[in-house]
Structure formats: structure tokens, C-alpha cells
Amino acid sequence: MQNDAGEFVDLYCPRKCSASNRLIHAKDHASVQLVIADVDPATGRAADTSKMYVVCGAIRRMGESDDCIVRLTKKDGILAKNY
């Protein structure tokens, strides 16, 4: 999409909850976004890659956000399977 000056701009792109696939609307101020950086085991420095998790306010309100983050990180291999 172009604005009045002719520059290309992006439209609003809503985020989706990583746990429930719900759309997170603009007024959901209880939602959180966690970015976990990959760390090089040899040097201990953060690599250029990271993994992002978004949890909507409804999941946080139910008190299930910690279980969702653990489940998602186990699936991605960040946490051990026997955690």
C-alpha cells in the first residue's frame, strides 16, 4: 500500500497467539511477546537467530501461560523433553 507521498508502507499486521492461534487485537494490553535468543555454547554469545513466542491476554488471565511456554519450548527443542 502507498501513502500520500508515494512511499510503500505496511498495513497493520496482527499477531497470533503461539499457544491458541487466536488473533491478538490492538487493545489486548495483557498480551506478552517473548523472544529467546539462541546462544553459542562455545563463546556464550547470542547468535543472530531467535525464537519468538506470543501469549494472548486470555491465556494469561487463565493462568496457563507458563504451561504454554514450557510446552512450546519443549516442542522447539529449547527445553529438555524430561523437564
UniProtKB/Swiss-Prot annotation:
GO terms for cellular component: cytosol; ribonucleoprotein complex; ribosome; rough endoplasmic reticulum. Transmembrane segments: none annotated. Gene3D superfamilies: 3.30.1230.20. It comes from Bombyx mori (Silk moth). GO terms for molecular function: structural constituent of ribosome. One of its GO terms (biological process) is translation. It is found in: Cytoplasm, Cytosol; Cytoplasm; Rough endoplasmic reticulum. Component of the 40S small ribosomal subunit. It holds the Pfam family Ribosomal_S21e. This is Small ribosomal subunit protein eS21. The gene is RpS21. It comes from the Eukaryota. InterPro entries: Ribosomal_eS21, Ribosomal_eS21_CS, Ribosomal_eS21_sf. Belongs to the eukaryotic ribosomal protein eS21 family. Keywords: Cytoplasm, Endoplasmic reticulum, Ribonucleoprotein, Ribosomal protein.
